[in-house]
């Protein structure tokens, strides 16, 4: 009989793939959601999607209240012509807690050229989200968006999949989308070709 942890891991993987592929095209092969000018596709329920430069389209500008200071807005437009990594997270999410150090490493890299990671906190109370940021020494800004309304602005990224990480090129077009936990090396590998473009 398989070990209970293996069964749980298999079940969680199946649920993640099911959530990532929650709507399908007529052939049943692609998860598709549409919003703004960028159209999100997850071919066959893939959890890492790369967009060639010729196929990239901009997302709508996003802005929202800061988790740490609700009187201040975090704005994508403040990083014009800079690479930005968007990350939907929640302090309740195990993979989100695991990847926070990786995101901080990427933030340190991007900050050298004026880029940033922008977190989008979902499904938390503001005090829990703020405590998580302070307790983990997170230096990048986060938007407080508990119902994840920004998902529509992000081209229909599935609001049910957390963490979700989107690497935007300098024109703020999605270059790579991760519908799962990431590592710093994966993000740096995705960012490197965008830095010279």
PLM regions and their residue ranges:
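Structural microenvironment flanking redox-active thiols in thiol-disulfide oxidoreductases
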Residues: 97-136, 146-153
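Hydrophobic beta-strand anchors of alpha/beta hydrolase catalytic cores
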Residues: 85-86, 117
């Amino acid at each position: 009989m398989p070990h209970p942890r293996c069964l749980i891991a298999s079940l969680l993987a199946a649920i993640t793939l099911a959530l990532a592929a929650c709507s399908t095209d007529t052939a049943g092969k692609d998860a598709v959601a549409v919003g703004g000018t960028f159209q999100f596709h997850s071919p066959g329920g893939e959890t890492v999607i790369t967009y060639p430069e010729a196929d990239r389209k901009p997302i709508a500008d996003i802005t929202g209240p800061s988790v740490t200071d609700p009187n201040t807005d975090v704005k994508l437009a403040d990083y014009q012509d800079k690479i930005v990594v968007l990350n939907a997270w929640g302090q309740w999410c195990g993979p989100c807690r695991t990847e926070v150090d990786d995101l901080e490493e990427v933030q340190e890299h991007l900050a050298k050229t004026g880029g940033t990671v922008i977190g989008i906190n979902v499904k938390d109370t503001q005090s829990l989200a703020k405590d998580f940021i302070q307790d983990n020494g997170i230096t990048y800004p986060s938007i407080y968006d508990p119902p994840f309304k920004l998902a529509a602005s992000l081209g229909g990224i599935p609001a049910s999949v957390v963490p979700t990480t989107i690497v935007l090129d300098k024109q703020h077009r999605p270059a790579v989308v991760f519908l799962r936990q990431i590592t710093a090396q994966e993000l740096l590998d995705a960012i490197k070709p965008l830095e010279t473009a």
